[in-house]
Design a protein with these regions (language model features):
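Phosphate-group recognition and catalysis centered on beta-loop-alpha active-site segments
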Residues: 1-281
Length: 281
């Protein structure tokens, strides 16, 4: 049975996601970890994966026609649902009539979840990283987080220091994932006065320069490596222990499309080193 990430306060979240030598390496489910019978951005898919191991759930937030926040990666319904056309041209009631489709094009019984539903389900189980699509106002996402009192289980994904600064000004207690490809990126974040303990660094889809990793770790900032795509393919070819090597070389969180395989490698790494966390049980 998978262990849960049990966080009660936003301070627990800062503590759990601050780098130290004993940090607990984690798998992040890219788009929620779709697999056969389990579509992307579906609560049932999150639950399936969370039953196997402690997970971060990366998911995508869009607006319906009537301004409901729903989980959907594409701006159209065609690829992942039984519907057609734009997400933003359908009301929530219309979206709820559709079924989600898995990556093999199989229709599942599952429905498009709202952000509310996801946060209500995930509290005390998982950490969400929310990829907020471009026309969605940060304010509306923050309102839902506040209503659900889900501050302890959410990280907001940003793609520039400007976006990170905006989120921090709107909600100074929320954790932020920011793109950090070099030391200049880190300097720009520091200029926005975002404290290190409220940051995760997305270092990109190739391993970060060791010097950058060291500086981030010295700041207590954990590094997310995007293995989705190229590095996942390498691991499938060379053997899944490659995932543990990424961790050994300074990644802390792996955003992957192979959560089972990455999770097995990380579990082995964790056991071998006797890593524990009071927040994972």
């Amino acid at each position: 049975v998978g262990k849960r990430i049990q966080l009660t306060t936003v301070e627990d979240l800062y503590q759990f996601l601050t780098y130290d030598d004993n940090r607990y390496p984690l798998v992040s489910l890219h788009r929620g970890g779709p697999t056969s019978g389990y579509p992307e951005n579906a609560l049932e898919t999150f639950a399936y994966n969370a039953g196997l191991q402690p997970v971060i759930v990366e998911c995508d937030v869009r607006l319906s026609k009537d301004s409901a926040l729903v989980l959907m990666h594409d701006n159209t319904l065609n690829r992942t649902t039984t519907g057609r056309g734009s997400v933003s041209e359908r009301t929530l009631a219309e979206l709820k009539k559709l079924r989600l489709v898995d990556n093999n094009k199989k229709i599942t019984p599952y429905k498009i979840p709202t952000l509310d539903e996801a946060l209500a389900w995930g509290k005390g189980k998982v950490i969400f990283t929310l990829d907020i699509k471009n026309d969605v106002p940060y304010e509306s996402v923050i309102n839902v987080i506040r209503q659900q009192r889900a501050e302890s289980s959410v990280v907001i994904i940003t793609y520039s220091a400007g976006q990170a600064g905006k989120v921090h000004n709107l909600a100074g207690d929320l954790m932020i994932s920011a793109s950090v490809k070099n030391l200049d990126d880190l300097a720009r974040l520091n200029e926005k006065d975002i404290p290190d303990n409220k940051l995760l660094a997305f270092v990109g889809t190739r391993e970060a320069d060791p010097q950058l990793t060291k500086v981030l770790h010295d700041h207590g900032i954990m590094c997310i490596l995007g293995t989705q795509g190229n590095l996942d393919k390498q691991a499938a070819k060379k053997g899944f222990q490659l995932y543990a090597s990424f961790i050994e070389r300074g990644a802390d969180i792996l955003s992957t499309d192979q959560p089972k395989e990455a999770g097995r490698a990380l579990n082995f790494y964790i056991k071998k080193r006797g890593i524990t966390s009071k927040f994972v049980q």
